[in-house]
């Protein structure tokens, strides 16, 4: 799983050039409920966060959960538990159950295209 995360981060580095990178990792997948850890240089100014189900070749097949800042302003967030919108965020798509053995892509975005990042993970 770490190899997939590294590949995802390297891909984001190439795509965003000088934009700020949000490094996303996955912790604690107990009961198919992952916790996402977000890191960057300085504060993580998050605008939105989405989780997609993906095919084996990495193509998104549908959103399983997404959140967005309630007022459009970025929020400082370092941890997100799947299905629980942090303070200052609202669900744009209600959380669907995650399934063991299925591959997902989690994507964090800063406002106005200032940066972002993501991770590909499989629920164990």
What are these regions (language model features)?
Residues 10-13, 41, 96:
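Structural motif
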Residues 55, 85, 110:
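Acidic surface patches and DE-rich sequence motifs
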Residues 100-109:
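Short, aromatic- and glycine-rich surface loops/edge beta-strands on solvent-exposed regions
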Residues 55-81:
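Aromatic (tryptophan-biased) beta-strands that constitute blades/sheets of beta-rich domains
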Residues 109-118:
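Short acidic/polar inter-strand loop motif in beta-rich domains
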Residues 74-99:
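Signal that preferentially marks extracellular ectodomain short beta-strand elements
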């Amino acid at each position: 799983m770490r190899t997939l995360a590294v590949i995802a981060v390297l891909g984001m580095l190439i795509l965003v050039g000088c934009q700020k990178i949000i490094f996303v990792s996955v912790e604690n997948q107990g009961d198919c409920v992952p916790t996402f850890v977000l890191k960057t240089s300085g504060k993580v100014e998050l605008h939105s966060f989405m989780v997609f189900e993906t095919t084996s070749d990495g193509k998104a097949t549908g959103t399983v959960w997404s959140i967005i800042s309630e007022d459009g302003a970025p929020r400082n967030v370092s941890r997100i538990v799947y299905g629980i919108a942090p303070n200052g965020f609202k669900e744009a798509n209600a959380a669907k159950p995650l399934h063991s053995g299925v591959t997902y892509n989690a994507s964090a975005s800063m406002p106005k295209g200032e940066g972002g990042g993501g991770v590909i993970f499989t629920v164990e």
